[in-house]
């Protein structure tokens, strides 16, 4: 993912960080054949764009971009943070390793995306319970994610962009 962060500190200092995603190096427009209809998003129905054949821009490997979130959050932490990266990721590591009771809203979201999550072995292993949607209150444990966060905490953003985590993602794709 990606995003934009605006920071205002108590002393009046601050700034912003734009950490948008980037298309993969081998991505090109011909990979995304347009159809003759629009995709309309959001309750306001004000956002639309041309539909892409087979949802190639939204589902599967051709929808994956280079995430900017790790770089953006680590940059923000370096500029304005008061703790080190390993301390910042520690609570998330604990939750990922020990698990937590799956909230109702997340269980519903996973059930809604069951067919899509079933298509890919990795998403099925992480987000489904023996091929079925996880139910509210299920113990949601993500050991591999905990290991990734530990590595990011030790190494920093370079782990995502050229390090072990980035290499693992590139190899899978």
Residue ranges with predicted function:
Residues 1-173:
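Noncatalytic scaffold domains of N-terminal-nucleophile
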């Amino acid at each position: 993912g990606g995003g934009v962060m605006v920071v205002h500190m108590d002393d009046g200092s601050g700034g912003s960080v734009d950490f948008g995603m980037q298309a993969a190096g081998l991505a090109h427009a011909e990979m995304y054949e347009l159809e003759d209809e629009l995709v309309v998003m959001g309750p306001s129905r004000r956002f639309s764009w041309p539909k892409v054949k087979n949802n190639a821009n939204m589902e599967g490997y051709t929808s994956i971009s280079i995430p900017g979130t790790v770089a953006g959050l680590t940059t923000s932490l370096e500029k304005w943070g008061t703790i080190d990266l390993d301390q910042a990721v520690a609570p998330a590591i604990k939750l990922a390793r020990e698990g937590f009771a799956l909230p109702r809203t997340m269980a519903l979201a996973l059930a809604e995306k069951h067919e899509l999550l079933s298509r890919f072995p990795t998403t099925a292993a992480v987000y489904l319970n023996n091929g079925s949607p996880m139910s509210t209150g299920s113990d949601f444990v993500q050991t591999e994610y905990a290991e990734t966060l530990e590595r990011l905490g030790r190494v920093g953003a370079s782990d995502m962009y050229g390090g072990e985590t980035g290499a693992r993602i590139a190899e899978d794709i």
